[in-house]
Amino acid sequence: MSSVSVHYSTHKINKVRFLNRNFHNDTSLFVTGTNHPVLSKNKISVWGLESRQNSDEIEELASVPIDGIVTELKVIEINNKPMIIGSTSKGSIFMYSIFNLPNKFEYIGYDGLLDKKYENYNNINNINDTYDTCNLLKERIWFNSSSNNNNVNSNNINNNNYNNNNNNYNNNNNNNNNNNNNNNNNNNNGSCINSFDISYDQHSLVTVGNDGVMNLLSIENLIPIYTNRYIDGLSVNVVKSITSNQIITSGELGRYIKFWDIRSNSSQPVKTIKTQCPRIFSLAIHKDEQHIIAAGSSDGQVNLFDIRNDYSIDQNKTHNSNVWELSFSKSNPNQLYSCSEDGFIYQYSYNKDNLGGGGMMTLPNQINNTFDIYSKEVSLLQLPTSIGSIDSFDINSNINRLICCSTSSQCLIVKSL
């Protein structure tokens, strides 16, 4: 029997993401971002989750203030270090590394020795910050000042792959602190970044925003390596990476899904699909069959498209309001999930014959990996009523847990699957 636990917060949490790694026990890490109307009161946090038979306990391990509403959030691993990457309504992309995880939340492969390098650096430079507890350390930040390409800049706060040369650390820190002050003075009001996505190889990330511009940034230093100013005449709502070179977007003009190839010499999309959706808020790409795209719209529709064609291959009118997020399951990519402003989360199973019922608990040898729209099963996930809009969700298949958040109820909900 599945369990549901509700955890109330003093903050309006609007983004939640798991770190998808194997942990030693029934634990996991997830991160959150907020959308407080007073922009200076927003923050990102890292949490620990302990999975139990009848309930789940969460614990906020560390947090840092963020200037602006958090519009998107990812957590990945770089050089054996968990890294939070996020975007804001004030036009910044930020990267924070997570240091000194409590022992019970250390995952397989986590290298805690990297933390000592920063402790040594602080001792040499007489910095009083302690790292006895879990902390978030700013690594890099980039400001979207795309109205003037010369103003697009990045601030690499800790680079050189954790250089052991302490003199280099000292020089780099002084230079970067000066750059940081200049950046903060000149770029606090960049164009809002509505969405970003990370390439499959984790070498780059792509951003879109209110300015209708697409930027491809190197994750190593957050320096733009490709810019296209002709994505849309208005704001772009969502972007997803198909491959390191292929990207899809949808914007305020609505109804259109555009496909881009940065290897092309043209600034125009290589393909455009006109949908029946009034406005698309969310996109998802099938992990194994990357020609299958899911789109969630403002009228509650969740439609599937095969980009080899110009029409939808499946339509679902399950929600009655904005579909904020979509995600294919990482463990069973033939399962799609959607969350909406109407307060519901749906699962769409496209497994051939739906062996094992299509649930998350299906054993690997019971899953038929064939994607089949004719074997679709749609189910509503049971959540507490009167929660309000479900703004974001994520699934950790290692512990069979779904986590979601609601800004209207200011809560996090953890559900076993």
UniProtKB/Swiss-Prot annotation:
Keywords: Membrane, mRNA transport, Nuclear pore complex, Nucleus, Protein transport, Repeat, Translocation, Transport, WD repeat. InterPro entries: WD40/YVTN_repeat-like_dom_sf, WD40_repeat_dom_sf, WD40_rpt. GO terms for biological process: mRNA transport; protein transport. Residues 152-188 are annotated as: Disordered. WD repeats lie at residues 13-57, 68-106, 188-227, 231-270, 275-315, 318-358. The keyword Transport applies. This is Nuclear pore complex protein nup43. It comes from Dictyostelium discoideum (Social amoeba). The gene is nup43.
